[in-house]
Amino acid sequence: MLSAVCNSQFMELFGDPVTNTQGREVRPFKDFMLDIRYGTSQPPTFNELGEFKFIRATNIKAGRITENDMLRISADEAAKIEKCRLNGNEIIIVRSGANTGDTCVVTDEYRDQYAGYDIIVTLNLEIANPVFFNELMNTHYMQAIIKPLTVRAAQPHINSEQVQNLPMLVVPLQEQEQFATFVRQSDKSKFELEKALSELTATYKRIIAENLG
């Protein structure tokens, strides 16, 4: 529901990012980047008591990071894949498999954690807000522009060059940041709603159990 609200708000403010209904300037994604790199090619040894989280493709859903089945690694394993350490505000793009092309922003709680095998994009924050670009890619732009790139090989796959050449709307940073604030507020509302529903369900189950007892 709330992701649909974000999509609708994006289209209202900035137009259709596929057909560019507002006639904005368009530049390749690389013009907004400071760095783009691949994650590790060798899986680390996992440890459920490890100090660090290891974000895989399966942890990236609907433009967000999910904790479901999150694996962990030790400090020793983390040291072997230092290039995968996250500073926060990167965008992770799944590079192969069923979820190829799915994206997320590395939010504050995942700073100093580790990305898995996927593409890690660091934007120039002086001109680009990662929340804005993540939401842009999670409009119907995902199905119209990104997903078709991933099916050109036998197995779904996207590479760094394809990501760098994605066409992106040019939007003033202030407008990007205002929209990003709206997205964060929507995410917070969604979290609070899910928490309230969870508490309500727990209360209902407790009442039923007490009555049956």
Put a short name on every predicted segment.
Residues 22-63, 77-81, 100:
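Low-complexity, Lys/Gly-biased intrinsically disordered segments
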Residues 40, 61-72, 91-115, 131-135, ...:
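Short, ligand-facing micro-motifs at secondary-structure edges
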